[in-house]
Amino acid sequence: MNQSVPLRLSGVDHTARPTWKLRETIEFYRDTLGLPLVHTISARGWGPESHPDFLHFFFDSGNGSTIAFFYYLGEPRPQERPLMPPTPDDHVFDATHTAWLTDSAEQLLAWKDMLEAKGVEVSSTTQHEVIESIYFRDPNGYFIEITVKLRELQPLDARDAALTLEAAIMAEQIANDHAGQVREIDTVWQEKGRLLSGQCGIKCEGPGIFVPALVEFASVVDAARHNSEYRVSQPSPGYFLIESNEALEFNRRELGLKPAVWYGLFTGGLCGRIDTFDKDRVRIVEQ
């Protein structure tokens, strides 16, 4: 093996899924979405005797990548899924989805208008932390997303992502050591709060929250600064820490946050425990 050759992946070539609806899938991706059909493989099995004969067809999905489908000839269709709205009702099935990037908010709304004009049920726009999206389903029930970037990712995003996953792994290890499971994201947030407190050399017993110094969370920090009972510090270049001697309380509508951002509000880390958390109000108290 040539160790002098640097290894680098150059992007996603294609994604693939099975389909039991040949005509409908072709018409949806080629005609409704306007993706050119660029390649088809037809084969008698693929080695193992148990592998059925199949068609494997590819649509151009932009920037040199394709989206592909396997159509297995004569194979029984799995239990038919009922017609589902473009909302994540089946979290396991819907976790597998394709998201296409568009260039602007105007383009995103234009896609929504075009799809609805063709009879496709489309979700309302959903603002996440760094993207805004619409969702719909193909004839197989697969989730499809079209999204626009709200900002570019920064080094802090990568650092915060690594801390979140480190906290999740630690929380799972602690739970496994006690024959338990991590069932609530609060456990991960609390572990991340402990990690960040240790890295900053401080003791944060709560109620307190670490807030990444990112634009989507700026209204939380601003609201805390205007509350005389809250203390705002920056113990780390990438994080603010909001603390109080009493409970911390925030209102989603007053902060101007969309639901998808609101429900991930404590991704920076939590000191204490969440006493109340509904669609508009959160209250954090001492552990």
Protein language model annotation of sequence segments:
Residues 1-5, 11-21, 58-62, 82-199:
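Vicinal oxygen chelate
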Residues 213-227:
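Short amphipathic alpha-helix segments
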Residues 51-53, 128-132, 238:
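Short acidic/glycine-enriched loop/turn segments that link adjacent beta-strands
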Residues 198-210:
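Short glycine-/aliphatic-rich beta-strand segments at the starts of folded cytosolic domains
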Residues 101-105, 207-216:
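Short, surface-exposed ligand-recognition loops at beta-strand->loop->(often short) alpha-helix junctions
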Residues 237-239, 246-287:
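Helix-rich interaction surfaces within compact, conserved domain-sized segments
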Residues 18-72:
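Core segments of cupin and vicinal oxygen chelate
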